[in-house]
């Protein structure tokens, strides 16, 4: 019930707009379609879509049935899609026009016992038309009991070697992500949140969950160019913007080179620049404040295994600690441990471990990998860190080498 949409008249998207009320109706229609097609609580529905107006209603339609939502990375090859469909035991796959070629390549193999729904114009012959099938479904919420400890979603890790791992989360985990986001940034129904990253990623949706919880306006943006971002902030009166480091760097470069002029945009309402998904250079924030001196700043640390961002965050009043990832977030605990799992002394380097309602249930169908990272409710992150004298956590290294590009491990 905490996910009820608070103000049905408030718009939810950029350019193509829908209200929260229509959003909810769309989610209900898809939920009822799934139920008509035999989807039961605990079964899985995959989402292979670019950011679009349909993405989030589809996601919540799945959750309303008690089934599990399984978002897939839009960069996956046909073989990777097939691997994820089979590992997660997906019963229905929803995909968009950008993926026709990849899905068609494996359709004969993955369609055995599975349904394929296509979102968009020109439905291919090997799939069924999402719009046509949902149009006549009931817009009433299905009467399915969903509990906090019920499985809710499977996310796939970025994966540093081989194929990605499947990460299982329950409904409590998703709900806590919404509460943490709202708590960390003081979001109200008057805030307008600009969501730019791909929605298959835990980070994008979990930040957006703050808007869902408050009934505030959310702006879903497809482009990442500096001009597109500033136009969206100006025209939609965005107050909170979540950026990745490359996007912030590109925006500053465009301002430095006089390609853009902030005087051309209405940006006075923009109160918070939120950045994360990879280490943030202090020099970037110093540079940012030259153009936006009144902005609050926050950074979040998180993993897909901790339902994305929020298990550690800097806090909007701690800009003097730029370079740190912060302290344990709302409802979370954090500690730094040695090889034996014992807490190290402040100032010493060890592995960061976190504990809270957003820790994954397990790596789906991989008990060995689960046992390596979950210990008495603590998630061992694989990130090496240390605390300063004030208890702020700084990342030092990875236990294993990894390259981060655009907020993702590769």
PLM region descriptions:
Residues 136-156, 163, 186-192:
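Conserved pre-ATP/AMP-binding loop-to-beta segment of ANL
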Residues 342-347, 351-410:
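Conserved ATP-binding/catalytic segment of the ANL
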Residues 17-21, 145, 152-176:
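Conserved AMP-binding A3 loop
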Residues 213, 238-243, 252-320, 333:
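Gly/Ser/Thr-rich phosphate-binding loop
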């Amino acid at each position: 019930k905490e996910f009820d949409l608070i103000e049905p008249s408030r718009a939810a998207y950029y350019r193509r707009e829908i209200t929260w009320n229509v959003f909810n109706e769309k989610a209900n229609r898809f939920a009822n379609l799934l139920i008509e097609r035999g989807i039961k609580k605990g079964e899985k529905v995959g989402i292979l879509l670019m950011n679009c107006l349909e993405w989030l209603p589809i996601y919540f339609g799945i959750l309303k049935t008690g089934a599990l939502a399984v978002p897939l990375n839009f960069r996956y090859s046909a073989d990777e899609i097939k691997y994820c469909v089979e590992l997660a035991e997906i019963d229905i796959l929803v995909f968009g026009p950008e993926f026709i070629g990849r899905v068609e390549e494996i359709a004969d193999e993955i369609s055995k016992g599975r349904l394929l729904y296509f979102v968009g114009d020109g439905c291919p012959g090997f799939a069924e038309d999402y719009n046509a099938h949902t149009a006549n479904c009931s817009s009433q919420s299905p009467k399915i009991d969903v509990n906090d400890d019920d499985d809710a979603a499977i996310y796939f890790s970025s994966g540093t070697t081989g194929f990605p791992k499947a990460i299982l989360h329950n409904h409590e985990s998703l709900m806590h992500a919404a509460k943490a986001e709202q708590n960390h940034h003081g979001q109200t129904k008057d805030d307008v949140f600009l969501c730019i990253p791909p929605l298959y990623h835990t980070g994008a949706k979990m930040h957006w969950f703050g808007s869902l919880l408050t009934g505030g306006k959310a702006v879903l943006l497809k482009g990442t160019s500096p001009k597109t971002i500033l136009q969206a902030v100006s025209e939609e009166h965005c107050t909170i913007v979540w950026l990745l480091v490359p996007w912030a760097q590109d925006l500053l470069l465009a301002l430095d080179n006089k390609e853009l002029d902030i005087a051309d945009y209405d940006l006075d309402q923009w109160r918070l620049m939120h950045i994360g998904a990879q280490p943030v250079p202090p020099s970037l924030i110093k540079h940012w404040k030259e153009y936006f001196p009144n902005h609050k700043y926050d950074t979040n640390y998180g993993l897909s295994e901790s339902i994305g961002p929020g298990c550690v965050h800097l806090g909007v009043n701690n800009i003097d600690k730029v370079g740190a990832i912060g302290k344990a977030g709302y409802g979370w605990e954090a500690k730094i441990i040695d090889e034996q799992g014992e807490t190290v002394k402040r100032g010493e380097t060890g592995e960061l471990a976190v504990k809270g309602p957003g820790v994954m249930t397990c790596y789906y169908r991989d008990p060995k990998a689960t046992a390596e990272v979950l210990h008495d409710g603590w998630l061992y992150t694989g990130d090496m860190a240390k605390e300063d004298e004030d208890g702020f956590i700084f990342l030092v290294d990875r236990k294993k080498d990894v390259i981060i590009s655009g907020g993702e491990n590769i």
